[in-house]
């Protein structure tokens, strides 16, 4: 059982406006703008591996509960639903994040500019409201390192902006395993957004409940998202999350963004009484409260220095304070343990983590066809722990650590034609242990794992992007060498300890296609080959050099084809493939490969000012039995988390326009 509450607010004064580049010679409605890249340009012109997923497409005939429903077409992204809503999705980009047993690790996540990743690198996707999402961008490769610590990849979610006419929407979905999801959303605007006093707004609320496909996997979640924008004058806009945009001049922009939040978690773990009685055991109940805040200031200048150039320099500061307690997950009743009750205190500590990162990014238009993007970030992370639970057999485990690293990245892009770009990029990444990874030492030892060191990686990538008719074809080859890779040491009874694994290598290839035929037919396809191996031995009893890194599929494939008119009947199908996944370092256990098929159909119509959408779907059409995810290096051999069999769902969406 887990109880989680999250509160966050951003308090910016001035937010950097998007720096638009010249569009390519294609229809505007076919251009997806990337804001997670070094500057806001089209997906075709971005000198990095990036994918943009439209929010309307993510909501099409979908439950709107998990990102795993709609991200299969993103190359290099392995997203698996654990069917365990206490642990969030298992999400990795090019193998980064695959070891996480809780939340999202090794990646940076932003929601409307607010980090959904804590300063220590631990993130979550459960706070992303699919119902009000405008777009979601996935940035892979060297440039993600410019976002600082734990940037093996970047996920940038952007909420919708209200527009005229005002609209009220209601959505509902019912599916197998007692699954319900329903929500309300109001959007609108006063004015056209270009004059002082103009206002836009989006307010979204929804509720999700399920009995779960496995025993004891029921869950419920309430989620709300609100966004309010106010045009202050012709060059300033205030967005209440809160974000504000101000252009100092035609050449200069200044941005200051502040945010703060709180997260509270209480989790009861199924651990027998005997292990909890050891003097160094932290108990079976985790009780923690986190307060986090940050500020990001940046200045952008556009001008000429022999050639057109854009400079962005800034300073990013983040801090987090955590109060972590542990209790026995039982009380004695008539001489017998009664589980599920908070017992005696077994852990009490206060952890502080903060980082301070200056950074510089530049863009040079060297010739009409050749451009250079380069940047550097100096990442400094400090960690301090104060132990307040000191007893005989459990000494003072207080300690501190600090980590520092230069993170350069660069990319050279050449426009072969107006519709075909090629690029080469390289960069260095840096990943410190999270507080969760420091929380436990191997062998039931007490105290924090200060022997765990940060990992560093170097990546090179070459890529190609081509506009083919009304479609986009992308390809990328990459290699990442990592030193001091952080991997799972042991996992048992809800406790996971970590260790450094020496050297690893990830090399692979990604292909992606998004092709539209005529006005209503759409084909999406993605394929990823990823060879992730240990280059040094990480096993105690045998040599693991050359073994595959567990938790990472070597091959992933996805294809979907659908008929999607604006009104009337629509239908689609998708097929997903995942090759086998090793479950331990020794490569003696693995989850077999699987292929599943899904179908959707629905009907859209309008009556006066009302738009309606009635749909149905079936997932895992052929009732394939497979492991949806694995728990890496689970000490008792319980590696596999089963996925649901064939399951069904129906939904109805209504929207009323106040015209």
Residue ranges and their predicted role:
Residues 194, 253-271, 415, 421-427, ...:
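Membrane-embedded beta-barrel scaffold of Gram-negative outer-membrane proteins
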Residues 298-305, 365-372, 477-481, 499-584, ...:
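Gram-negative outer-membrane beta-barrel transporters
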Residues 128-171, 181:
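A beta-strand signature from Gram-negative outer-membrane beta-barrel systems
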Residues 319-328, 334, 382-389, 400, ...:
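Surface-exposed extracellular loop regions of Gram-negative outer-membrane beta-barrel proteins
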Residues 187, 229-231, 243, 424, ...:
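Conserved C-terminal beta-signal and adjacent last beta-strands/turns
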Residues 174-209, 213-251, 363, 375-377, ...:
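Transmembrane beta-barrel wall of Gram-negative outer-membrane proteins
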Residues 237-239, 243, 248-390, 415, ...:
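Face-selective signature of the C-terminal outer-membrane beta-barrel domain
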Residues 106-107, 114-140:
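Short acidic/polar hinge/loop motifs at secondary-structure boundaries
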């Amino acid at each position: 059982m887990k109880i989680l509450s999250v509160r966050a607010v951003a308090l910016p004064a001035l937010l950097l406006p998007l720096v638009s580049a010249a569009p390519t010679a294609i229809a505007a409605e076919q251009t997806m703008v990337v804001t997670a890249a070094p500057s806001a340009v089209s997906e075709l012109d971005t000198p990095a591996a990036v994918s943009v997923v439209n929010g309307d497409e993510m909501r099409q005939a979908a439950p709107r509960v998990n990102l795993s429903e709609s991200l299969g077409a993103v190359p290099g992204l392995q997203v698996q639903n654990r069917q365990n809503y206490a642990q969030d999705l298992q999400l990795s980009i090019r193998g980064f994040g695959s070891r996480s047993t809780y939340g999202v690790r090794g990646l940076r996540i932003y929601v409307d500019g607010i980090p959904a990743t804590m300063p220590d690198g631990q993130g979550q996707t459960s706070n992303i409201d699919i119902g009000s999402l405008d777009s979601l961008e996935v940035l892979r490769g060297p440039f993600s390192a410019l976002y600082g610590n734990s940037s093996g990849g970047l996920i940038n979610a952007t909420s919708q902006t209200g527009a005229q006419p005002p609209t009220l929407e209601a959505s509902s979905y019912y599916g197998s395993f007692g699954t319900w999801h329903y929500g309300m959303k109001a959007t609108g605007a006063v004015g056209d957004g270009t004059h002082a006093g103009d206002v836009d707004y989006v307010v979204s609320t929804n509720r999700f409940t399920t009995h779960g496909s496995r025993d004891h996997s029921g869950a419920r979640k309430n989620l709300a998202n609100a966004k309010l924008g106010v045009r202050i004058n012709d060059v300033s806009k205030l967005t209440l999350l809160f974000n504000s945009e101000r252009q100092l001049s035609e050449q200069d922009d200044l941005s200051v963004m502040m945010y703060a939040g709180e997260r509270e978690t209480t989790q009861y773990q199924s651990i027998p009484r005997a292990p909890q009685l050891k003097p160094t055991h932290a108990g079976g109940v985790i009780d923690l409260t986190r307060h986090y805040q940050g500020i990001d200031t940046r200045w952008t200048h556009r001008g000429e220095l022999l050639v057109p150039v854009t400079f962005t320099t800034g300073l990013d500061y983040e801090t987090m304070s955590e109060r972590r307690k542990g209790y026995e997950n039982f009380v004695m009743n008539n001489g017998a343990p009664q589980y599920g009750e908070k017992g005696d205190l077994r852990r009490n500590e206060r952890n502080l983590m903060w980082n301070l990162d200056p950074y510089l990014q530049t863009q040079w238009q060297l010739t009409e066809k050749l451009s250079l993007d380069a940047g550097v970030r100096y990442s400094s992370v400090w960690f301090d722990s104060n132990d307040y639970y000191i007893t005989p057999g459990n000494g003072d485990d207080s300690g501190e650590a600090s980590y520092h690293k230069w993170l350069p990245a660069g990319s050279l892009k050449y426009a072969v034609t107006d519709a075909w770009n090629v690029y080469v990029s390289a960069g260095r990444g840096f990943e410190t242990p999270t507080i969760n990874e420091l929380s436990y030492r191997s062998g039931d030892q007490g105290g924090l794992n200060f022997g765990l060191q940060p990992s560093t990686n170097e990546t090179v990538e070459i890529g190609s992007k081509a506009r083919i008719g009304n479609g986009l074809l992308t390809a990328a080859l990459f290699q990442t060498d990592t030193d001091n890779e952080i991997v799972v040491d042991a996992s048992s009874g809800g406790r996971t300890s970590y260790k450094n694994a020496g050297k690893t290598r990830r090399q692979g290839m990604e292909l992606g296609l998004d092709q539209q035929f005529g006005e209503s037919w759409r084909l999406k396809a993605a394929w990823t080959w990823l060879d992730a191996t240990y280059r040094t031995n990480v096993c105690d009893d045998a040599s693991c050099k050359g073994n595959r890194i567990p938790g990472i599929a070597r091959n992933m494939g996805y294809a979907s084809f659908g008929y999607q008119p604006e009104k009337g009947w629509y239908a689609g199908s998708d097929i997903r493939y995942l090759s086998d996944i090793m479950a331990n370092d020794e490569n003696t256990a693995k989850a077999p490969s699987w292929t599943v098929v899904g179908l959707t159909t629905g009907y859209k119509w309008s009556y006066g000012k009302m738009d309606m959408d009635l749909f149905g779907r079936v997932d895992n059409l052929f009732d394939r039995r497979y492991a949806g995810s694995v728990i890496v290096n689970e000490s008792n051999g319980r590696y596999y988390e089963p996925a649901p069999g064939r399951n069904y769902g129906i939904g109805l969406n209504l929207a009323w326009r106040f015209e």
